[in-house]
Amino acid sequence: MKAMIRRSGVGLSIYMSKKDVEEPVVAVENEDLWGGFILVRNGWLLGLPDLPQGTRLPITVEAMKQPDQD
């Protein structure tokens, strides 16, 4: 799904237009953000594309929602 990632005064947030949801990012797998997973406050685990380190924000990317784990 298309997602816009931006940095605010309190950290990273992600907006998913298809769901009309904006949530803060609570955890990142990779320090440079790209090519790993992020955990969103609503519990979604999203895979991000592998982009160069230093990619400027805000940016719209194709994020992949991981299946729910029980």
Curated annotation (Swiss-Prot):
UniProt keyword Lyase, yes or no: no
Gene3D superfamilies listed in its UniProt record: NifT/FixU-like
Arranged from A to Z, the UniProt key words for this protein are:
Nitrogen fixation, Plasmid
Q: Which InterPro entries match?
A: NifT, NifT/FixU_barrel-like_dom_sf
What GO biological process term is on the record, naming one?
Answer: nitrogen fixation
Task: Give the family this protein belongs to, as stated in its UniProt record.
Answer: To K.pneumoniae and A.vinelandii NifT proteins and to the N-terminal of R.meliloti MosB protein.
In its UniProt entry, what is this protein called?
A: Protein FixU
